[in-house]
Amino acid sequence: MAETSSLISGVAQRYAGSLFELALDAKSVAAVEKDLDRFEALLSGSEDLKRLISSPVFSSEDQLHAIGALADKAGIKGLVGNFLRVVARNRRLFALPGIIAAFRKIAAEHRGEVSADVISAHELSAAQQNELKATLKGVAGKDVTINVTVDPSILGGLIVKMGSRQIDTSLRTKLSSLKLALKEVG
């Protein structure tokens, strides 16, 4: 499992780096980010699309035609539209979520921002996200972009990963620590 994750991460980094260089040359990093956001919204809203990009059952041609038609219908043209077609042709659609995340991190670093991955037990409101960004900015000394993921299994609290640092205030971790402490006592 770790090897598969590492493979996807490596593929995602290479493709994201290439896309970023092309976007930088074309002076269209912001436009590319918007198109990737639009595609990610389509992806998160469609189980069929998730199946298309992750299943090896579909042929390269089927994936290419489906992604091309979807990109055209969603108005994703130019650099991102062509990029999605190349990724489909090369049978790397499975790495798209990682590519999008890696592109965001590269773009944020280029703008002088720090990226933080936040795992929450429930959806964070805009006010909570803004407060978290301000707090993390005080720690990092730079603007912080947050990528929020909802994971109900942490029960409560947050897990924040920023660079090489991780802050885990989840209720699950606190309960695990308490359980260990009680085992040592008893």
Curated annotation (Swiss-Prot):
GO molecular function: proton-transporting ATP synthase activity, rotational mechanism
Protein keywords: ATP synthesis, Cell inner membrane, Cell membrane, CF(1), Hydrogen ion transport, Ion transport, Membrane, Transport
Subcellular location: Cell inner membrane
Record keyword Transport present: yes
GO cellular component, one term: proton-transporting ATP synthase complex
Functional summary from the UniProt entry: F(1)F(0) ATP synthase produces ATP from ADP in the presence of a proton or sodium gradient. F-type ATPases consist of two structural domains, F(1) containing the extramembraneous catalytic core and F(0) containing the membrane proton channel, linked together by a central stalk and a peripheral stalk. During catalysis, ATP synthesis in the catalytic domain of F(1) is coupled via a rotary mechanism of the central stalk subunits to proton translocation.
Family note: Belongs to the ATPase delta chain family.
PANTHER family reported for this sequence: ATP SYNTHASE DELTA CHAIN
Protein's recorded name: ATP synthase subunit delta
Protein's organism: Brucella anthropi (strain ATCC 49188 / DSM 6882 / CCUG 24695 / JCM 21032 / LMG 3331 / NBRC 15819 / NCTC 12168 / Alc 37)
